[in-house]
């Protein structure tokens, strides 16, 4: 919400918008390109990049429409409440996504592995050991090394925890009316997120080139890249949201009492922090 809320009409009905449908189409193209890319299809990288560019363009115009409506004084307290509920349900849906992925990991480790290690399978594959990270029966998967918690995952954990602190400081500065401090701490939060993604990319290069850990490395490889990759996507989206918020802070769009765009992005970022803590423990330590 912006500083213009005091001018809001009693009731405002947003007009039709093409952006939700365009966002869905763009994300579909992105996922088609990504899925084909990991399967070695030659044209896949171009489709994936096209989809990403389309997503960015859609977000640019969609955010622009919302900002213009807010700055025009069209948003009332009821609209503000609807945004809060919408963001809450959106984050809840993301929680369900990660719950499904964590559930997959739990099933594979706690149910499937003991089943694979029972007496029947020992008779069929006498050299098979039912331990998490095992490559499976001989010849089914290339040998690889599992990813440990040091040093990159631990560094990334410290980076995200620190970013949560800097974002909280920025929010307190916003509520106190200190715009410069708000912008500085918010910029540091975005910078920490960018450094996190840089280390994540380096970790993937290390996994592929030195550990031979790939998406095709059995259930371990698929769950590892699914969980960490999906989380990395959320960090990227959170950094984009915070960048838009930083732009609006510098433009003076917010007041100490009306700044839900800031709060919504902060909710999302803290959610990303909490998910990473779960990943750090379950994926890298256990």
Q: How does the language model describe each region?
A:
Residues 1-286:
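...captures the hydrophobic TM-helix bundle architecture rather than a specific catalytic motif
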